[in-house]
Amino acid sequence: MNDQWYKHLIGARTIKTGIAIFLTAVFCMALDLTPIYAILTAVVTIEPTAKASLIKGYRRLPATVIGAGFAVLFTYLFGDQSPFTYALSATFTILFCTKLKLQVGTNVAVLTSLAMIPGIHDAYIFNFLSRTLTAIIGLVTSGLINFMVFPPKYYGQVEEKLSKTDALMYKLFYNRCQELILSRLQSDKSEKAYKNIFNLNNQVETLISYQRDELSYHKKKECDWKLLNQLTKRAYTNRLFITHLSNIIYLPKNTRVNFSGDEKMALLKISSSIKDIFYDGTFKREDDSVETLRSTIKALEISGENQIKSHILYEVLMIYRLLDSRYA
């Protein structure tokens, strides 16, 4: 806990950005170069992972060179007091970056291009080369800092978001079953809650991908990979749960489904046992209720009637099976 105190005060990424800016400025001043362009590059190069910094930095460098080149070209043609110089420099920089698939570097390329125009004067070649050099300094410094200083660890964030996802999933499943028991097949409230859970799980998967990238670029212990695999498996199960949950939320309009008393009781018991997982950490099996729903599905398959009802009960059993496997 003590080695992560900085995260509660300012954030590791913010600290790394500050260090990268400082060192970039030091290197540029030591070489008698204007540091502002290198600093712009350094700031945008700090990414969530070292891999992202390297990949995007590889594309930002040529984009910056393109921006500097157009700034010099149009300053030579129109001078640094013409609106055409600024407009054409920005336009052609964006155009070429897009055509060459260097979009990740477009922002810093345009900023560099526009910022350097007032200071070019007649030193066209010198300004072009110096801006290219400062961009390299910013990219390299920022990339190394991101790789070496405070390598990001997303385990805590992933576990926190997974726990939140679990709680919201179980609650929504319980509430949705209550709606189904009352024959409320359409529910804006459930749809809104589902979208929130879906977005939250996407955040989890993004953080997991970040952590996997970090582990591939740093030598880590086997326990780190083991923990990541456990979190990945848990997120995958949640993805399946969410998918099945969506299938009982988004139902055809103008559809009516009626459940018998035994079926309602089975839905109530299963949904209650799943909701209670968040409170006591255990999954209470409801074998009798499961068998009731299975019998109903078999009967509906034989008769070929009420496919929507069969579909709903099947999805409920699939969710039950997922959790039965997770807590086996």
From Swiss-Prot:
Keywords in alphabetical order: Cell membrane, Membrane, Transmembrane, Transmembrane helix
Entry GO terms, CC: plasma membrane
Main location: membrane
One Pfam family in the UniProt entry: ArAE_1
Position of the signal peptide: none
Transmembrane helix keyword on record: yes
PANTHER family in the cross-refs: ALUMINUM-ACTIVATED MALATE TRANSPORTER 10 (PTHR31086)
Family: Belongs to the UPF0421 family.
UniProt-recorded name of the protein: UPF0421 protein SAV1889
Record organism: Staphylococcus aureus (strain Mu50 / ATCC 700699)
